[in-house]
Amino acid sequence: MPRALWTAWVWAVIILSTEGASDQASSLSCDPTGVCDGHSRSLNSIPSGLTAGVKSLDLSNNDITYVGNRDLQRCVNLKTLRLGANEIHTVEEDSFFHLRNLEYLDLSYNRLSNLSSSWFRSLYVLKFLNLLGNLYKTLGETSLFSHLPNLRTLKVGNSNSFTEIHEKDFTGLTFLEELEISAQNLQIYVPKSLKSIQNISHLILHLKQPILLVDILVDIVSSLDCFELRDTNLHTFHFSEASISEMSTSVKKLIFRNVQFTDESFVEVVKLFNYVSGILEVEFDDCTHDGIGDFRALSLDRIRHLGNVETLTIRKLHIPQFFLFHDLSSIYPLTGRVKRVTIENSKVFLVPCLLSQHLKSLEYLDLSENLMSEETLKNSACKDAWPFLQTLVLRQNRLKSLEKTGELLLTLENLNNLDISKNNFLSMPETCQWPGKMKQLNLSSTRIHSLTQCLPQTLEILDVSNNNLDSFSLILPQLKELYISRNKLKTLPDASFLPVLSVMRISRNIINTFSKEQLDSFQQLKTLEAGGNNFICSCDFLSFTQGQQALGRVLVDWPDDYRCDSPSHVRGQRVQDARLSLSECHRAAVVSAACCALFLLLLLTGVLCHRFHGLWYMKMMWAWLQAKRKPRKAPRRDICYDAFVSYSERDSYWVENLMVQELEHFNPPFKLCLHKRDFIPGKWIIDNIIDSIEKSHKTIFVLSENFVKSEWCKYELDFSHFRLFDENNDAAILILLEPIDKKAIPQRFCKLRKIMNTKTYLEWPVDETQQEGFWLNLRAAIRS
């Protein structure tokens, strides 16, 4: 018994382990190219069953705590491994040993307290390594990255425990495109620790305090292209001129992101610009200036310029004491060499005239997302302001009058590119004044409803997208590029108004079609973007778009953005894939063919009706319908005649002199209905026939060659035949007055022919001795 329990327990463990492995393997989704996605699946270990077919593995944002030597040993072709945002605290020495093709490794935001160089000793082709956000204090006891000659992006450090950088830490690295060091609590920086890296394209340094900043700058200033400082309080920053003044520098760009300045520390930064002579571009992003802008007592007057800085960018500048801020007149002299200035989303409402006049080299000015209005723009664009300015961006400010804006900018004689988009102009006056060299104008998202001659005739590029325009009828002889997407245009502009247009973007309007002739009329058009419209996929439109192989070279968004809106059965389909039926595309031909077919059908029907007596059948149907309105059989008391006699006029002698004598003078006499004497004069013949038949007990047909040929007999039979033989009774008595060929009976009397073939009829005997028997049989038939 104990042995049986032990066996059952072992099998249960095996089954549960297998199910667990199967569940983990199923939590991965892999595509045919070997890209496996397992992020955010609540995994607590690396799934088993991974093979050499896996080339990219994403296990980020899980609960993995451990990476073992065998977890990834079969993934020999793995190129990308993402293990970020887990709970990994242990990585065995040979965990990545078999990943010789690995190019991207992310171990960020785990719980690694120690780093080992043995992890990376076989990763010769590794290009990207992210170790941010772990718990380590240093980068290990030995050189961590000496086996990574192809590494181009490296991210190390954390915001709390990483406190030391030593000289050995970056040994073996000669060139990095990007190096990010998160060292908010850095306490020890050994000089020359970063100097071993011969070239760094972009260094991102997170520091809380600037105590060690100058020491780091000394090591990198000769090997760095772009230096980015983040999350730093520079209130106590002091720049030592002696530390850098005698060194050659390669830094071309400085970026300050989420950095705090005071008036004093800002002056120290300006000194840095002056001494690091290679700096061409400076950017302040989401920074805070804790001062009032009073630099007069801070020896700023001894600095004549901002070094070689040509581009200055300021985004989201916060000034807590904004309403106490000085006029910045002390920094005006420093701006003479600056060529490009961007001050975005920083509550700028005025550029003082004097500052504008000092910006003598300025070619590009971007004041987007600020508070500029026509009143303040008048002061900013004063006489002699920005004398070489070519591009002015006033996007999303508080401008309201297009006419006044153009007039205020007349002082800018060299202005050729103006962006005043996202201002609420609403309307456009008939005439405006603009600087004489204007070539580019951006009026997108300004809520204008129509375009007028206000626009300068010198324009080469015009952007009026995202407005309420329903037409474009301006003559702009020099316009080369037109951006008019997201409006309400129903058709392409007239090409004669835009003779040199080469680029047109007119997507997301309400255009429903365009033709080859329209496109050909734009003789210089090279690029057209017209997707996102409600196209009517007519036969002509589909024939044009699907038949032009070169159309894709002109339509940049072809074919995915071109969808049918109608007809309904192709709605939503790509224009390239839509198909219409023959009847939709050749309606005239189909209608003509249908008319011809109908004519032939009518002609054939007429021939058949004539051949098979169709008119007779219709007349019979009409007579029958009329008769149907009356009782199918007259009440017994309405029977007035013993028999109705249908006969040919040429057989009247036999009927009137023999039959009448034998029947009406018999005792008791029979009462016969003869059309000559008993039809009511003036009554419609149809009613006479129908009434006579209905009031007669029997109907006697006197058949002969004359009967078959007689038009009168045919006429009687035309209107009596249907009712007599539709009732399936024995009311008809056939008398064959003379032998006739059954084939001579018309085909339309099919039931009469059938009766003659299936029922007995009376034949008039030539022998007088047999005639008495004939009359006896006839009287008996009438009485039956």
From Swiss-Prot:
Record's function text: Cooperates with LY96 to mediate the innate immune response to bacterial lipoproteins and other microbial cell wall components. Cooperates with TLR1 or TLR6 to mediate the innate immune response to bacterial lipoproteins or lipopeptides. Acts via MYD88 and TRAF6, leading to NF-kappa-B activation, cytokine secretion and the inflammatory response. May also promote apoptosis in response to lipoproteins.
A GO-annotated cellular component: receptor complex
Superkingdom of origin: Eukaryota
Motif ATG16L1-binding motif, chain ranges: 761-778
Comment field on protein domains: Ester-bound lipid substrates are bound through a crevice formed between the LRR 11 and LRR 12. The ATG16L1-binding motif mediates interaction with ATG16L1.
Secretion signal, residue range per the UniProt entry: 1-20
Descriptive protein name: Toll-like receptor 2
Sorted UniProt keywords: Cytoplasmic vesicle, Disulfide bond, Glycoprotein, Immunity, Inflammatory response, Innate immunity, Isopeptide bond, Leucine-rich repeat, Membrane, NAD, Receptor, Repeat, Signal, Transmembrane, Transmembrane helix, Ubl conjugation
Repeat region (LRR), residues: 54-77, 78-101, 102-125, 126-150, 151-175, 176-199, 200-223, 224-250, 251-278, 279-308, 309-337, 338-361, 362-388, 389-414, 415-437, 438-457, 458-478, 479-500, 501-524
Disulfide bonds listed in the record: 30-36, 353-382, 432-454
Post-translational modification: Ubiquitinated at Lys-754 by PPP1R11, leading to its degradation. Deubiquitinated by USP2. Glycosylation of Asn-442 is critical for secretion of the N-terminal ectodomain of TLR2.
Site (Interaction with bacterial lipopeptide): 349
Phylogenetic placement of the source organism: Eukaryota, Metazoa, Chordata, Craniata, Vertebrata
Residue intervals on the Cytoplasmic side: 609-784
Protein family according to the UniProt entry: Belongs to the Toll-like receptor family.
Gene responsible for this protein: TLR2
Pfam families: LRR_8, TIR
Placement of covalent cross-link Glycyl lysine isopeptide (Lys-Gly) (interchain with G-Cter in ubiquitin): 754
